[in-house]
């Protein structure tokens, strides 16, 4: 395709601001989606965990044909823990669509990804979404975004950004919040007008950098990236240059383009287009594919350093091997090595013993997604509690700090301020917003935030919004942070849990187990309401005598136990 008719754009948004919904509507209204896919909501979230958590973890590519233009859209993760995905995506596009909620305005993750976009010199198009909500305040949000851009050091050109107002769920967009068009046409037209065509030479020798990887059982590894020069056809011979500069010869089997959500085989792809390449084994992210006669590798893509680590090890509890299919250290090691191929922000090192592996990532969420993925794939493993990664600078110890933005009702302010004080956080700003809510901004050490989210929801009765993003490494704060106020209930006997015992124990705290589950001696079965640990017997049955007949029991009602 002629590069003048090509547009490459990435969508940036905070978690749950409607990014994937917006892409769905663009696909439907441009006529790119066929009927069978129209019933599925959030089509771009293809992974089970993405649909359940309501977040995007992996960057997706899709293409829309609009009038005589072809628009390549890349959906980026909104969470800073997946920052390495964002980094690579931005190397493939000429502009970004910044999507902001019309109620909450820009959030920390918006700040994180926008900063990355400005560093790459990209000009944003601002989309203020959810303007149909009764509490929407689009003009306030616009001021907040302008202030954010200014704080991030945007150039005059970047500050002169275009604004579109939208209601993605209803499939409407317009130039004014109270004058939306019948469909998404204003947004699609804006993309074709304002986004520059790729600055590439289609007659130069072929060159392409791998920005993402996929695989399937038929063709093996699939390399995804943007062609930065020349053109490519199936069966072309190329030279692969890795980030260390080592060269090897290879042959391309297929060239796949995008049409909607489908990958379609193409006879030729030219510079500026985002394509998938198959047939080359052992591809890695950052590898450059070059014309054999003109070998000029592109600079390797940079990735943020990990900040949190956990130990993965073989499950050595008395119940080992009962639930999982893959239980040995060899299974765990192979799976982690497989994950390293496409999860480039992950680090895996040997642990203190042969069956332990130290796994480091960008944050709690990054590692929890990996653990949950492995659990669903039938891996059985034990994990340690998360530890932050500290650095030595000269003779000083530095630790990671995060910006934490908390949006709560005013009556919860005292409890939150007290708890953040215990976690060694410093208050940076406090703004009272409309409807009796307030926004607090803290600078907190990462170790103080581990395990805080569930407690935060309890303190705010589920009405608070907590977001955090890595900011910098700074001087470590002295002293330990007490992350757990409660003691635990520990089983002093092995056996099966019984409702009678649990009914009497639930007054002492929250249970982790329900009725009829096998437990072992020493297993933690609940949270104690006080700060000391309590040995308990969850297997105790009711003593039956002639005086106390089984039929005269009171009705035992168990409070639902905490499930992980």
Task: Identify the role of each PLM range.
Residues 123, 133-193:
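Canonical P-loop GTPase G-domain recognition
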Residues 102, 128-130, 137, 168-169, ...:
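A short beta-strand-to-loop transition that corresponds to the Sensor-1 phosphate-sensing loop
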Residues 86-100, 105-149:
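Conserved P-loop NTPase nucleotide-binding/switch module
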Residues 16, 22, 54, 73-75, ...:
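Residue-level signature of catalytic and energy-coupling elements of molecular machines
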Residues 142, 160-162, 182, 189-193, ...:
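Accessory interaction regions appended to the cores of large information-processing enzymes
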Residues 1-100, 104-106, 144, 213-216:
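P-loop NTPase switch module centered on the Walker A-proximal segment
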Residues 209, 216-217, 485-486:
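Flexible, glycine-rich loop/tail regions that form catalytic "lids" or insertion modules at the edges
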């Amino acid at each position: 395709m002629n590069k003048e008719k090509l547009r490459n754009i990435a969508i940036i948004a905070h978690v749950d601001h409607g990014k994937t919904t917006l892409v769905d509507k663009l696909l439907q209204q441009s006529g790119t989606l066929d009927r069978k896919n129209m019933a599925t909501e959030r089509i771009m979230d293809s992974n089970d965990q993405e649909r359940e958590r309501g977040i995007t973890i992996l960057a997706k590519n899709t293409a829309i044909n609009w009038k005589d233009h072809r628009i390549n859209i890349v959906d980026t993760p909104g969470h800073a823990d997946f920052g390495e995905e964002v980094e690579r995506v931005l190397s493939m596009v000429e502009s970004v669509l910044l999507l902001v909620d019309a109620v909450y305005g820009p959030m920390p993750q918006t700040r994180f990804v926008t900063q990355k976009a400005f560093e790459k010199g990209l000009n944003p198009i601002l989309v203020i979404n959810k303007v149909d909500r009764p509490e929407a305040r689009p003009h306030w949000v616009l001021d907040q975004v302008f202030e954010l851009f200014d704080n991030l050091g945007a150039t005059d050109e970047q500050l002169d950004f275009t604004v579109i107002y939208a209601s993605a769920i209803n499939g409407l967009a317009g130039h004014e919040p109270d004058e939306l068009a019948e469909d998404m046409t204003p947004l699609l037209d804006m993309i074709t007008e304002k986004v520059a065509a790729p600055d590439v030479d289609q007659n130069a020798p072929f060159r392409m950098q791998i920005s993402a990887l996929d695989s399937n059982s038929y063709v093996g590894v699939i390399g995804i990236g943007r062609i930065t020069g020349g053109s490519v056809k199936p069966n072309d011979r190329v030279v692969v240059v890795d980030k260390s500069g080592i060269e090897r010869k290879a042959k391309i089997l297929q060239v796949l383009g995008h049409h909607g959500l489908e990958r379609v085989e193409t006879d030729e792809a030219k510079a500026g287009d985002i394509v998938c390449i198959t047939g080359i084994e052992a591809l890695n992210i950052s590898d450059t594919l070059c014309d054999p006669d003109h070998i000029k590798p592109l600079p390797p893509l940079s990735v943020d350093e990990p900040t949190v680590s956990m130990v993965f090890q073989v499950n050595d509890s008395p119940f080992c091997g009962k639930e999982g299919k893959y239980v040995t250290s060899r299974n765990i090691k192979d799976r982690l090595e497989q994950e390293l191929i496409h999860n480039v922000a992950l680090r895996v090192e040997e642990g203190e013993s042969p069956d332990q592996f130290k796994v480091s990532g960008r944050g709690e969420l990054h590692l929890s997604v990996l653990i949950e993925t492995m659990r669903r794939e039938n891996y059985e493993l034990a994990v340690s509690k998360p530890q932050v990664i500290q650095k030595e600078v000269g003779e000083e110890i530095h630790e990671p700090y995060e910006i934490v933005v908390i949006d709560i009702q005013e009556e919860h302010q005292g409890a939150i301020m007290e708890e953040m004080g215990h976690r060694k956080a410093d208050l940076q700003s406090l703004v009272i917003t409309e409807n009796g809510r307030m926004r607090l901004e803290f600078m907190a050490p990462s170790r103080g935030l581990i395990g805080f989210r569930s407690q935060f929801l309890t303190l705010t009765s589920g009405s608070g919004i907590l977001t955090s993003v890595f900011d910098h490494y700074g001087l470590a704060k002295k002293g330990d942070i007490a992350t757990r106020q409660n003691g635990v209930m520990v089983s002093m006997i092995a056996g099966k849990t019984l409702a009678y015992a649990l009914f009497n124990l639930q007054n002492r705290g929250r249970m982790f187990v329900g009725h009829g589950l096998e437990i072992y001696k020493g297993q933690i079965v609940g949270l104690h309401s006080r700060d000391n640990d309590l040995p308990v017997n969850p297997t105790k049955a009711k003593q039956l005598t002639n005086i106390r007949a089984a039929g005269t029991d009171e009705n035992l009602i168990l409070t639902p136990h905490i499930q992980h």
